[in-house]
């Protein structure tokens, strides 16, 4: 399991990040959608997904 940092901008152009532990990037996005209502409502808002070392 690896740590992923996901980032996005909301409708006010404010920058946000969330960290998720997952086996791959797809699972990290799935967890983020479950944890953050904005990502769930706007599934294509993610700017970056970075796998941390």
Task: Pin down the residues of each PLM region.
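Generic alpha-helical structural signal
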Residues: 3, 27-28
């Amino acid at each position: 399991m690896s740590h992923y940092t996901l980032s996005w901008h909301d409708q006010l152009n404010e920058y946000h990040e969330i960290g998720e532990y997952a086996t791959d990037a797809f699972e990290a996005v799935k967890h983020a959608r479950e944890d953050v209502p904005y990502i769930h409502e706007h599934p294509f808002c993610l700017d970056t997904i970075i796998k941390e070392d």
